[in-house]
Amino acid sequence: MICKTQKLNNGKEIPTVGLGTWGMEDEAVLEGAIRNALSLGYRHIDTAFIYGNEKMIGNILKKLFDEGVVQRKDLFITSKLWNTFHGCPEDGLRRSLNDLQMDYVDLYLIHWPVTFDPAPDGTVESCGKKYNVGKFDAVGVWKKMEALVDLGLAKSIGISNFGKANTEKILGTCRICPAAIQIELHPYLNQKELVEFMKSKGIQVISYSSLGSAPGSSAKVRDDKTIKAIAKKYGCAPSQIILSYITAQGICVIPKSRSKEHLRENIDLKELSREDISAIDALNTGHRYVDPPGFGPEKFK
C-alpha cells in the first residue's frame, strides 16, 4: 500500500502526492486546478518564486480559506529560493511569503546549486536567457537557510537539483540537515544511485517531471510501449503506472494537472509486481528533460 505521507528527518510529514504548479500562469486555470485538487484530498501545493504564480496562489488560497474550504494548518506549501537570492535567502523567502499571503512555508528549497549575481542595475529578478553566473557557496547559503527555520519562516528546509558533491558539503557542516531534495526523476532518469545516497542520509526525495515530458520535448515516458503495456495490464492510465513506480520507492511526486479526472488518477496509485517494477527499471537511459543551458558547471553537482 502506498503511504499517504512520508516522514521527514525532523519528524514532520509531507504528503506523498502533491500538486505541481510550474507553468500554470493563468489565474482562472490555476484556481480550477487547486480547487479540484483540494476537493480530491490533495494537501501539498508546490510552487517557486521563479514560477511567477505565487501571488495568484496566495489570492486563490485566501479565497478558499475565507470560504472555509480548507485551513492553512492543513496544507503543506513548498516554495524555492531563486538563484539571485543566494546572498540573502531571507529576502527571497519574505517576497514569496508576501505573495502567498502566509507567515511561513512548510518546505523551502534552494532551487539550484547555481548562483546568479545581480544584474548591473541591481535587480535580482533575472531569469532571462542571459545569466550572470557567480560562484555557488553551498555551505554559506545553507547557513542562511538554517536561519529561516530559526525565524519561523520555514518549517523545513531542503535542496533541489543537487548532486552528491554539494550535498556532502552541506552535511559536513550543517546544524539543520536538509529535510528533502527535489530532483528530476522518472523511468528514463531513475537516479537510483543518488536516491540511495539521499535515503542513507535521511533526506526525503521528491520527484519532479515525474511523467517525463517538457515543453518541446519529443519522446514522452507515458508514451513508452513498456509503460503502456503495463498500464493496459492494470487497466489504468500510463501516468498512474509511472507515479506508482516512483512512490513505491518512498519517493514523493508533484505532478501537474488542470483536469479533475487526471488529478484523480494521479492519487489512485497501484501496487506493481516486482516483474513490472524491474521492467520499468530497465527503461533508464539517463535522459534529462530539464537541463537549462547557461547554468554553469555546478548544476546537478
Curated annotation (Swiss-Prot):
Active site: Y51
Compartments (UniProt record): Cytoplasm
Catalytic activity: an alditol + NAD(+) = an aldose + NADH + H(+); an alditol + NADP(+) = an aldose + NADPH + H(+)
Positions of transmembrane segments: none
Primary localization: cytoplasm
Gene Ontology CC terms: cytoplasm
InterPro entries: AKR, Aldo/ket_reductase_CS, NADP_OxRdtase_dom, NADP_OxRdtase_dom_sf
Top EC class of this enzyme: oxidoreductase
Top-rank lineage group of the source organism: Eukaryota
E.C. number: 1.1.1.21
Function: Catalyzes the NADPH-dependent reduction of a wide variety of carbonyl-containing compounds to their corresponding alcohols with a broad range of catalytic efficiencies.
Protein family membership: Belongs to the aldo/keto reductase family.
Protein name: Aldose reductase
